[in-house]
């Protein structure tokens, strides 16, 4: 399955400002988002399931892959395209056994060692970061910058997306590294015009 990682949206309901998540995701896709990750922290399993199911109605309609952050059970329950796992989440090999070979598994990495390990273990793509300082993640160990991104990108052969503080003023510098895509939260969700915000992050619009 060929996946377009160019513009990777991660959901965060804290940025909704009273708007419906389904509508926000739809507008983002219409603006150019190519893949959506549903990320929910500190909510019940039932609530996460309901949110993910709601988003999947939109992604299915537009034939855009939907990735679930961390929770394999939710991914299975809604038949998501795959999961995204952090360094402290379930091991990739176990996740692959559970989900099977046809599902997408992405791994967050912050250095060359983690990247090579994830690639060797069969990750489908990597989320590389944190590139720039960001308010979305509080447990950031290290900002790697463009140089750190380039080093990791040059060490691997699988697709990757950059994450962390990427916005319309710096995304072109990130893409110059040859990375397959950028992953954003607030650069789209914190804007009033979601569709325009997404479109402003496309290199070939």
From Swiss-Prot:
Keywords: Magnesium, Metal-binding, Thiamine biosynthesis, Transferase
Taxonomy, superkingdom: Bacteria
UniProt keyword Signal, yes or no: no
Annotated binding of Mg(2+), by residue: 70, 89
Pathways involved: Cofactor biosynthesis; thiamine diphosphate biosynthesis; thiamine phosphate from 4-amino-2-methyl-5-diphosphomethylpyrimidine and 4-methyl-5-(2-phosphoethyl)-thiazole: step 1/1
Cofactor: Mg(2+)
A family per Pfam: TMP-TENI
GO MF term set: magnesium ion binding; thiamine-phosphate diphosphorylase activity
GO biological process: thiamine biosynthetic process; thiamine diphosphate biosynthetic process
Cofactor binding comment, as recorded: Binds 1 Mg(2+) ion per subunit.
Keyword Lipid metabolism: no
GO CC terms, sorted: cytoplasm
Residues that coordinate or bind 2-[(2R,5Z)-2-carboxy-4-methylthiazol-5(2H)-ylidene]ethyl phosphate: 134-136, 165, 185-186
Catalyzed reactions per annotation: 2-[(2R,5Z)-2-carboxy-4-methylthiazol-5(2H)-ylidene]ethyl phosphate + 4-amino-2-methyl-5-(diphosphooxymethyl)pyrimidine + 2 H(+) = thiamine phosphate + CO2 + diphosphate; 2-(2-carboxy-4-methylthiazol-5-yl)ethyl phosphate + 4-amino-2-methyl-5-(diphosphooxymethyl)pyrimidine + 2 H(+) = thiamine phosphate + CO2 + diphosphate; 4-methyl-5-(2-phosphooxyethyl)-thiazole + 4-amino-2-methyl-5-(diphosphooxymethyl)pyrimidine + H(+) = thiamine phosphate + diphosphate
EC number(s) per entry: 2.5.1.3
Binding site for 4-amino-2-methyl-5-(diphosphooxymethyl)pyrimidine: 37-41, 69, 108, 137
NCBIfam families: thiE (TIGR00693)
Family: Belongs to the thiamine-phosphate synthase family.
Function noted in UniProt: Condenses 4-methyl-5-(beta-hydroxyethyl)thiazole monophosphate (THZ-P) and 2-methyl-4-amino-5-hydroxymethyl pyrimidine pyrophosphate (HMP-PP) to form thiamine monophosphate (TMP).
Protein name as annotated: Thiamine-phosphate synthase
Organism, as annotated: Clostridium botulinum (strain Langeland / NCTC 10281 / Type F)
